[in-house]
Amino acid sequence: MRHGKAHRKLGRTSAHRTAMFANMSASLIKHEQIVTTLPKAKELRPIVEKLVTLAKRGDLHARRQAISSVRDVEQVGKLFAVLGPRYKERQGGYIRVLKAGFRYGDNAPMAVIEFVDRDVSEKGKDSGPVYVNDAED
């Protein structure tokens, strides 16, 4: 019987899951939209919704709780400075999960997870190192 089993294991150890969701939360806060598999997106939604609720509270204890969950102080800063005030009047439902077809290699169901009233200009901003070709001089 499957009583009391609230979450998916996703084929990972508990430490791996915790780290993965911390990284995915930071990426979602940073870019306000990410593409992942559907089960991961469904598991990520309540985690980020609770973080936004902490940001709406806005006190020091809430900030420390968010830092312990996300482990990225810069993204927690954005969470409390931008996303908390943006959703101040909304009573939950900050995240949307959209089905996005199937992945080519293994036919895994994919999904787009995004904030409801997201800032479109944040997508892809500072998403990693960029190659600069110096040989063209």
From Swiss-Prot:
NCBIfam families: L17 (TIGR00059). Part of the 50S ribosomal subunit. Contacts protein L32. Signal peptide: none annotated. This is Large ribosomal subunit protein bL17. HAMAP family: Ribosomal_bL17 (MF_01368). The keyword Ribonucleoprotein applies. Gene3D superfamilies: Ribosomal protein L17 (3.90.1030.10). GO terms for cellular component: cytosolic large ribosomal subunit. The keyword Ribonucleoprotein applies. It comes from Caulobacter vibrioides (strain NA1000 / CB15N) (Caulobacter crescentus). GO terms for molecular function: structural constituent of ribosome. One of its GO terms (biological process) is translation.
